[in-house]
């Protein structure tokens, strides 16, 4: 078996998650690059959503022993507990660390951030309470529980990458144990299925965060191989020679047709993408072949 990695760089529409707020004001998480501000969906938020949606967290057990952490011991470790595939640090009775077999980047917006502020309140709830308790809403606002609030909002095209070290899936060196090849295939497939049909929720907004454009496959490079050559701006992919050369190293490109990109016809003509369903189907076949 060759020591290889599965890597994907994905472009999808999604809502940003939120950082610390100030009073009743919530701000989206952002990064600063080249003097500009870009909204993000953090890698922690993405990873948690993928682990939950894939069912990988279904067997999660948590213990609180000075710190809140995943339960790990000789009977429950990364070889037989899917929830531990994303890594763990156990400090009881001694410290044991098992790194994740896959890594995500933040999902960074393709275009600079434009502030869209939304204003809301709980008027209906406050009105119902005021009516039930004979309170004059306009005169006794605090007593009625009326609370205005506002938050920044960003739903935009974002780019992120995920890379698996395929030889670390299901392996726990802390307990010298390893999952079966069938279990390894199931774990990778579960995460791929979640990414293909990813749905994200934040502040009551349900996002269809399925991939619109995807580059990747299984290869020798244990890094986010396409991260530095996939560039989308103003809904247009920059089709460079470096991008084409990397695709020539045995990788594929998939697209969800529907006019999501201004130069969709150029992408189809120059990169010859396959459908999104075919991309994931072939990738799952590659994973099965790799482990078998």
Predicted ranges, named:
Residues 1-292:
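RNA-binding basic/glycine-rich loop and surface signature characteristic of RAMP-family CRISPR effectors
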């Amino acid at each position: 078996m060759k020591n290889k990695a599965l890597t994907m760089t994905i472009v999808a529409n999604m809502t940003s998650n939120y950082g610390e707020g100030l009073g009743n004001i919530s701000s989206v998480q952002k990064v600063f690059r080249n003097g500009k501000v870009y909204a993000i969906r953090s890698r922690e938020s993405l990873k948690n959503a993928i682990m939950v949606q894939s069912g990988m967290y279904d067997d999660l057990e948590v213990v609180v022993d000075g710190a809140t952490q995943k339960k790990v011991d000789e009977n429950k470790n990364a070889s037989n507990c899917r929830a531990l595939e994303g890594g763990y640090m156990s400090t009881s009775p001694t410290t044991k660390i098992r790194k994740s077999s896959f890594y995500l980047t933040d999902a960074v917006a393709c275009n600079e951030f434009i502030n869209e502020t939304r204003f809301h309140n709980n008027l209906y709830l406050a009105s119902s309470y005021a009516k039930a308790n004979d309170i004059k809403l306009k005169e006794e606002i605090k007593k009625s529980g009326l609370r205005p609030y506002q938050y920044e909002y960003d739903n935009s095209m974002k780019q992120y990458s995920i890379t698996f070290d395929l030889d670390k899936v299901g392996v726990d060196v802390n307990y010298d144990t390893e999952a079966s090849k069938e279990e390894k295939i199931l774990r990778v497939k579960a995460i791929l299925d979640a990414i293909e049909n990813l749905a994200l929720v934040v502040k009551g907004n349900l996002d269809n965060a399925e991939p619109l454009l995807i580059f990747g496959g299984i290869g020798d490079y244990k890094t986010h191989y396409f991260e530095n050559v996939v560039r989308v701006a103003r809904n247009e992919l920059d089709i460079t020679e470096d991008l084409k050369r990397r695709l020539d190293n045995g990788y594929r490109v998939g697209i969800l047709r529907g006019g999501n990109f201004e130069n969709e016809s150029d992408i189809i003509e120059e990169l010859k993408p396959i459908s999104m369903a075919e991309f994931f189907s072939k990738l799952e076949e590659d994973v099965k072949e790799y482990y078998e």
